Amino acid sequence: MVQAARKFGYEGVELRALAGSLDLLSRVEFSAPQLAQTKAYFEDEGIEICCVDTSCTFHSSEASERANQVRIALAHAELAAKLGAPLIRVFPDKIQPGAQRDETRDWIAECVRAVAERMPDGVDVALETHGDFASAEAAAEIVKLANQPKVKLIWDVANSVAAGDTIEQAGRVVQHYLAHIHLRDAKPVTGSEHWLPVLAGNGRVSFAEALAVIRELNYDGYISFEWEKYWRPEIEAPEVALPDFTNAIRNLLEDRSDTPECSGVGK
C-alpha cells in the first residue's frame, strides 16, 4: 500500500482493507505490540493516514445492534488516534424492511452523536454520502440532527451523483460539514443500483466539474481516490487505476500550487 502510494504520486492513504481483510482491528500490524512500528513506517515513508475506514452502519431497527456498531466505531477511533489519523469513516446506510425513512435517519443521527461525544482528541467521525442517504441533502440532514461539532461529512462524489445530485448542488450542501472527499469516475449498470467504477473519462462523474467546485469551496483536505476492486473484481487492477487517476487530475490542473492533496485508498 505504502509503496504503491509513493510509486504513483499519492501523499496519503485511507485505511480500509489490508491483505484481503476488512477487519483492521484484527490485523497484527495494528495490534499493541506492533502499532508503534506501523505508525513509524508510514511516517518514515512520508505517507499520511488521512482516514481510518470502518464498515459501521447505524440503520438497524435493533437498538442493541446500533449500540454494537457505536462500540466498533469507537474502537476504530482509538486506532485512528494512535496512528495520527484525523478521521474515521462510517456509513448511514440502508432503510431496513419495516422501518421508515425518518426513524432510520434519526437512529443514524443518534448513533453518530453518541460516537462523536466519546471520540478521542484529534479525531472526528465522518459520515459518508452512501446507501439510502447518498444524496448530499440526506447526509447533511443527519449531520444537522446530530448537532455535534465532531460529526463531519465525507462527500463521495460518485455516490451523490448516482443519487441524483449535480456536483455543483452537492458541493453547496456539504461545504459546511466537509472533512474528506472520495472521487472516482463511475457509470450506471443495467439491473444494478450500484454504479460501476471506471477509469477517468469513461463514466458520468466529471473530474473537471468536481475540481472546479472543490476550488470554490476552498477545501484543503484530501481528495481520496476510491477504487472498489475488492467488491468489483471485474474492474481494472489498482496498478492501472491508481496512476490513471493522478494523471487525470494533474492534467486538469492549471495551477498545481493550490491543488488539494491526492490520496490513495485501500479499496
Where are these regions (language model features)?
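Active-site beta-loop-alpha junctions enriched in small/polar residues
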Residues: 16-18, 54-57, 93-95, 128-132, ...
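Histidine-acidic metal/acid-base catalytic patches
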Residues: 1-11, 136-267
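Active-site acidic/histidine proton-transfer and metal-coordination neighborhood
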Residues: 2, 6, 35-37, 41-51, ...
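A short acidic, helix-capping loop that chelates divalent metal ions and anchors anionic groups
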Residues: 21-25, 58-63, 94-100, 162-164, ...
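A structural motif
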Residues: 10, 15, 47, 80, ...
